Amino acid sequence: MKILDALLFPVIFIMFFIHLSIAQTDPELTIMTRLGQVQGTRLPVPDRSHVIAFLGIPFAEPPLGKMRFKPPEPKKPWNDVFDARDYPSACYQYVDTSYPGFSGTEMWNPNRMMSEDCLYLNVWVPATPRPHNLTVMVWIYGGGFYSGSSSLDVYDGRYLAHSEKVVVVSMNYRVSAFGFLALNGSAEAPGNVGLLDQRLALQWVQDNIHFFGGNPKQVTIFGESAGAASVGMHLLSPDSRPKFTRAILQSGVPNGPWRTVSFDEARRRAIKLGRLVGCPDGNDTDLIDCLRSKQPQDLIDQEWLVLPFSGLFRFSFVPVIDGVVFPDTPEAMLNSGNFKDTQILLGVNQNEGSYFLIYGAPGFSKDNESLITREDFLQGVKMSVPHANEIGLEAVILQYTDWMDEDNPIKNREAMDDIVGDHNVVCPLQHFAKMYAQYSILQGQTGTASQGNLGWGNSGSASNSGNSQVSVYLYMFDHRASNLVWPEWMGVIHGYEIEFVFGLPLEKRLNYTLEEEKLSRRMMKYWANFARTGNPNINVDGSIDSRRRWPVFTSTEQKHVGLNTDSLKVHKGLKSQFCALWNRFLPRLLNVTENIDDAERQWKAEFHRWSSYMMHWKNQFDHYSKQERCTNL
């Protein structure tokens, strides 16, 4: 037996070596990029076919040591074949332990070990003969700028790449303090380096995606939540605009209450973090040196304590208005038309607020029906709009209360869902869509540039050309997945359209229904059609299904579609009445009442309460008046 083993060993070794050599020389699996060779792997898809995946390709030097908090540096070339057959480490981030073992939260936690050496990207290529000039779709994950990873199962690009014959790319970027800690004037911690990670990955796509059969002139960036806000920020940032073609924004935009902070607030949070981890007060250089000396988990453990108030849908380290990445605030840039002139597709889910309510709103839990008392509702409103004064809070309460049934615990629960979702997602996104669409009309009418007050030359802003390329497509996703593990009252939750965009219902073992598989195929087609042509209705062969046409959103008609298992339906006005409160009335109200002295503010608040009481009294009196009276006394 030993002699036989001795004879067989060289044969086995040679066969293994031949197999390895074939794998390394297979033109499908080994690609030469500008930086060096990468070796990928074949991944199966449900129809007995496969895609080619290149997982964990480095696009930046590891941001370790002195590079912590600094902008990324492009990856240097390598000599050997880089093994790109498995996902990279996740960037350091907060891990949600609120519901241990519960798949609804665990699916968003990193599924790879965490490391600061995390700036890698993934590429999925359809297994077509010699792919060439394919449309490219680059995914940017969400997670409140404090979490997220490109390796999550829900972001698996194989199904979208295979079904729509597009090249799918996703990247890791730094989050939390590692990506967004900012000290004004400091080159060591300028802020926004997480966005610069994304931009460097987009530059890698421009430089290398043609080696994988992709077209660098046909790149659509898409993302969800903070990932969608990031997409919108690249639409605004002048240096990002040339690096992609179109944009899809799912449940997030760059304007709104949680996406950015001022440099003063960013500095306050950086200093507070230093104190929390034991850094002595001193100058910026000393602070950064001390923060760099700390273990990554030390910073993660303290990050939530830097917030100036307790609120829902608020995050510690987010992009900062720096005058470089952002020449001005997102609101100001939108209002002046200073954004990329291109087509956008964007939308929201039906219940954008429910997910965030279980993380601190009084009375809410995933483990019960969350029937909310009036007292819990009023406390929840304060947490939902932490920047508002008493008058502003009364305005929100007045708008969202059913005064004929104000103590109804189900209606209070639904109102809280609407308040959080409308304030943070729906209404900022509606405003973003309207501003984009409005500038398309203005440029068509004037046919002239207004770049004198913008100064961006040929940077691709919507207001520098009379021939605007802008068109807007808006959706409301309102299908609750049949296998969703969250309670029924949470509805169509923030983030749960992603699995349909990435084609997970095509995987039989995941137990979606046939109707959900069809919905997923439709959504992938809409997304890919838009990426190819700027119009979700135009199929890859140029045909259009006239029976189910998705109309352009305009600032006047405001048409949008409902995405669900039914046939496509067109609606008008995305929560227009409620968004008038958030986008127009409340900002003006807070501005007018900002300088009112305490006595007058208290009087006005009491007056609003009295008005509400009188309205309630009148309703009760009217009800009493309509009752039959006893006539026998």
Swiss-Prot record:
Domain of life: Eukaryota
Signal peptide feature range: 1-23
Residues in coiled coil: none
Compartmental location: Synapse; Secreted; Cell membrane
A GO molecular-function descriptor: acetylcholinesterase activity
Membrane topology summary: Peripheral membrane protein
Annotated Gene Ontology cellular component terms: extracellular space; plasma membrane; synapse
Annotated glycan sites: 133, 184, 283, 368, 511, 591
Any one GO biological process: choline metabolic process
Entry keywords, A to Z: Cell membrane, Disulfide bond, Glycoprotein, Hydrolase, Membrane, Neurotransmitter degradation, Secreted, Serine esterase, Signal, Synapse
Residues of the active site: 225 (acyl-ester intermediate), 352 (charge relay system), 494 (charge relay system)
Reactions the enzyme catalyzes: acetylcholine + H2O = choline + acetate + H(+)
Keyword rRNA-binding tagged: no
SUPFAM superfamilies, per the entry: alpha/beta-Hydrolases
Pfam families the UniProt entry points to: AChE_tetra, COesterase
EC number: 3.1.1.7
Disulphide bridges: 91-118, 279-290, 427-579
Principal cellular location given in the protein's record: other
Family the UniProt entry places it in: Belongs to the type-B carboxylesterase/lipase family.
Chain's role: Terminates signal transduction at the neuromuscular junction by rapid hydrolysis of the acetylcholine released into the synaptic cleft.
Name assigned to this protein: Acetylcholinesterase
UniProt organism field: Electrophorus electricus
